[in-house]
Amino acid sequence: MKFFASLSKRFAPVLSLVVLVAGTLLLSAAPASAATVQIKMGTDKYAPLYEPKALSISAGDTVEFVMNKVGPHNVIFDKVPAGESAPALSNTKLAIAPGSFYSVTLGTPGTYSFYCTPHRGAGMVGTITVE
């Protein structure tokens, strides 16, 4: 028993240091968590526009297109980076109820352009740059 007590006294500082260093390395190596950002479909002044119209995000972030005030609105991606599918990212269903939303996670760096089918001619278009 005395043998184990003397070992623990000698190695306790070393063991503590090893645990501290290992914990620090594990925490510092953790990837940054992905963010969720919102784009309003329609402005607070009832204009048929996306707000903001242009957005920059990090790869892996999620964009929520939130129905604001009056619709109907949708999100159709037309130009996307190579390797992505515009139809797969798009939401053709028209949102009508305020507060309803459509989420999409963008993982490939590049520029994504999108529009609202009913209001494209009125300028309801936007871009997302993924870095």
UniProtKB/Swiss-Prot annotation:
SUPFAM superfamilies: Cupredoxins. Pfam families: Copper-bind. Keywords: Copper, Electron transport, Membrane, Metal-binding, Signal, Thylakoid, Transport. It comes from the Bacteria. It is found in: Cellular thylakoid membrane. Residues 35-131 form the Plastocyanin-like domain. This is Plastocyanin. It comes from Prochlorothrix hollandica. The gene is petE.
